[in-house]
Structures are given as C-alpha cells and as structure tokens.
Amino acid sequence: MEIIKDLPEVFEEFAEQRQKSFLAVKQLKDKGIPVIGSYCTYFPKEIAMAMGAATVSLCSTSDETIPAAEKDLPRNLCPLIKSSYGFAKTDKCPFFYFSDVVVGETTCDGKKKMYEYMGEFKEVFIMELPQSQKAEVLDLWKAEILRFKEYLEKKFEVTITEEQVREAVKLENEVRTSLKNLYGVMRHDPAPIKGHDLFRVLYGSGFKLDRTLIADEVDALTAKIEKEYAEGKREDKKPRILITGCPIGGATEKIIDAVENNGGIVVTFENCSGAKSIDRLIDEDAEDIYQAIAERYLSIGCSVMT
C-alpha cells in the first residue's frame, strides 16, 4: 500500500476518524454486529474481537458534560471520570449509546463509583483488576478474562473458540507493531513530524472500527514519513519532550499545543493513549493463549498498580 496524499491531509483524516466512526458504529448496529465499549487499556479487546464484535473507546475528553455529571458525582472527583459519566448520562456519546455492553475495570475508586451509577442505565460488565502486578495475582486476572469470555458467550449466544482468540491476538499484535513503528520515527533528531500529528494517528486509530485496515495504513504512513525525512523534510531541531500520565484527547490536547507552540516538540506519548497501550505484544505462540493475554495486560504500566 502506498500513500499518494500529502502528509498533512493524512494526519487530518486520522484526526477526523472519531467523528467518521459515529456513523460507522450505527451501521454496524444496523447489521447486527455487537459493539463493546470500554474506557481503559486494561480491557482485553481480543476476547470481544474473537466473537466478531466491534470494540470502541468511549468519550471522555471534553468538559462539556461535567456539569451534568456533578449532579450525581462529587465535584472534587477526577474530571476525566466526570466527563466520561457525563457523556454517558446525557447520551452525547454515540459510541456509548450504541454499545451493547460497557466493560469496566476496578482501577481507581472514582471509576468504581462511576460504573456503579452507570449500571443503573446501561449494562456494565466489571472486570476485577488485581491491584498488584505480582506473579501470584496473575491467575486471578486470567480467571477474570475467562469470566469475560463466558459472559460474552452467554449474552450473545455464541461460542468463542481458541482459534478465534488466536486470530484476534495476531490481528491486534499487527496493529500494535505498526503503531509502535510509527512512533519510532520520532527517534530521529530533529524529528520528522510534529508530535501533535503523531498523536492524531495514535488517537484516531483507536476509533477505526475495522481493525483489519489499520496496520497497512499505518505502515504506509510510516514509510512515507521516512522517505520524506531522507529527502530533507523535517522539523527544526527543538527541545524533545515526553508526555506521560493520564490519557490525552480533545480538551487536553492543549498540553501538546502548549509545548509545540513554545519551541518544543513532543516526541513520545508514554500514557494510556500512547506507548502504554501498544508497546507490549501478546505471545501468539503461547501454549495457553489466555495466560498470555493475562500476562500482557497485567504488565501495562499504570499508577493504580503502585
């Protein structure tokens, strides 16, 4: 696959992917395809993908719905949680509206309370995430993944086979590898592209409901960036900044702009919408694929585990 468009146009298309998928998710529902929504990178999407479901990240990146959320939740609660709950409560997130089930996880206390309230108007499946990454809790997390599999089988009256799970693992590994190779271009100094353009691809790819298309598109983009870099098209040499912490998107993209409008360049997103979600792969050849899935997800770096 070769990209014939200019890079700015490609970056803009990824930036618009979330809005494009509003219509796409309705079309999936009309076809009878299950939609599974989630808020966290600990969500083992391969299990849902194995049964042919579409997985989608739910809205939580604007302060627009916080006033509605504060009618139920404490005002001093994390704004990310209030935004998530507000979008859900007001039906302003099409992805939430069309989700057959929302998968929650026991990370922080605020999200636990959010899911409790959310369960009053939406079906929510809670995965009990161990608050540790010690080896002895791995069996507990594997059991939760199997419980999630059994829940999906019962709810949607399907059988999820090991072969289907392995196929989903292979597909998602390809997506992660492609995205990892993409942000690897930022090793160049000076950088080949702006950090905000990199972010648009990382963030927008999460809203592409057909996961089979992502790897080829991103690989082609990476090749084009490298080609243009070799031809001398690159940013000026600038201070290189790493962003870590909570997810970024929507209103919080102003953090990227604050850096890049003042002489710096963001070269890495070491957070939930960046490296944390794509750095580690699942061992496709593992004898016990569910154990491999559990190991991969439990090894994600998150402050809730410390």
Model-derived regions: residue spans:
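A charged, amphipathic alpha-helical module
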Residues: M1-P34, L146, E150-L281
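Metallocofactor- and cofactor-centric catalytic cores in central/energy metabolism, strongly enriched
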Residues: E9, A15-K29, I33-T41, K45-E46, ...
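Gly/Ser/Thr-rich loops at beta-strand to alpha-helix junctions
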Residues: G37-E46, E105-K111, G245-G250
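Redox- and metal-dependent alpha/beta enzyme cores, enriched for Fe-S-associated oxidoreductases
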Residues: I47-T61, A68-A69, C246-T306
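Short, surface-exposed amphipathic charged segments that create phosphate/polyanion-binding patches used
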Residues: L73, D139-R147, L281-E287
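Glycine-rich, highly charged phosphate/nucleotide-binding loops
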Residues: R75-K92, C302-T306
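A polyampholytic, Gly/Pro-enriched intrinsically disordered region
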Residues: P79-Y85, E144-E153, A286-Y297
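Acidic/His-rich segments in extracytoplasmic proteins that coordinate ligands and/or metal ions
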Residues: Y85-K154
